[in-house]
Structure formats: C-alpha cells, structure tokens
Amino acid sequence: MEKNTVLLQDTEAFMHGELDNVTVQQNCIVLDLVQGGYVPYGCYTSAPIPMPLFDALRVSWNAASPEDTAVEAQVRVMVDGNWTTWNSFGKWSPSLHREGPPYQARGPVQRWPDRLQLDSKYATAVQLRIYLYSKNEKVSPAVMLLGASVRMVDVIPARGRLVNERLHLSLIHISEPTRLL
C-alpha cells in the first residue's frame, strides 16, 4: 500500500526545504533573529514530495502563534508535469478572526476552505509552503508540523483491466431448422 500522508515535523525533515528569512531551531521553524529582533516575515518551502496518484488534498500544520504573529499555509500540486499556482489556506492566529478562505476555482484546481480538489485531473506530487509573520520584533510564530494527506485514485489503464485470464464459454450446439417442402 502506498503512503498517502506526509508529515514534516523535525529538524532533519525541515532542513530538506528552502528557508527564506526563517531558521530551524529545536525542531521548529521560526523567523530569523537579526540584531536582537525577529524579521517581520519569512517563508519555508518544502522540497517537492512525490505522492501516489491523487485528486484531493488536505493540508495540516501545528504552530504556536503568540499575539501579533500569524502563519499562512500554502500548497501547490503537480498536474500533467506542471506545478499549479500556490493556493493559500488563509492566515491563522489566535488574534485573527479564524476562517478558511472562500471557495476558488483556477483551472483544474478547486480550493475549498479546508481542502484542494482536482476536477477531472490527477496530481503526482505536492509542495508545501508556510509564511510566518510578526508585527512585534520580540516574538516569532513557531511551526512544529507541516503536512498533507491525499485522496489516492485508482485509474483503469487505457487498455482496460483483465477480468479473468480466460473467457469460459459453454458449448452450445445449434441445429439447423428443417425445411418443409
């Protein structure tokens, strides 16, 4: 059985991604500290993650977000060998009104408040991104986990599936009708 969930949740996993104004410390992604203060924003982007063929995805994250900080999770998927645009699941913080973004459709991608769904297409990889924001240079949000679960699809090959190796037919004898003169 193929794995349909990926979780990035420790220093080793996070270090495979791209760090932009963020660093990894104590198994968490945090904003960079420059001259005694945290930078106002930063971004972590995972390496591309191959997945079994899928048509829907849910993003998960765990973060500590003190007052005046927020995080924003985003995802993109590979469809027909090309990456879709990034899809945001909104900014989240205890100090913000919590709600997912409204439904949006772009090409084959439908982004619902809690999931990404593909319309008549399938994806083969996922890439995760999370922005960290702070209005206070003394505090930073901390991301402990970033993950995704996909709904795998089973596609019938173009040539079809074999039902049985052999087609079992019983012999039937058909006689010709007799002609009357």
Residue ranges and their predicted role:
Residues I172-L181:
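Single conserved hydrophobic/aromatic residue that forms the stacking wall/gate
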Residues M1-H168:
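Beta-strand-rich ligand- or partner-binding modules
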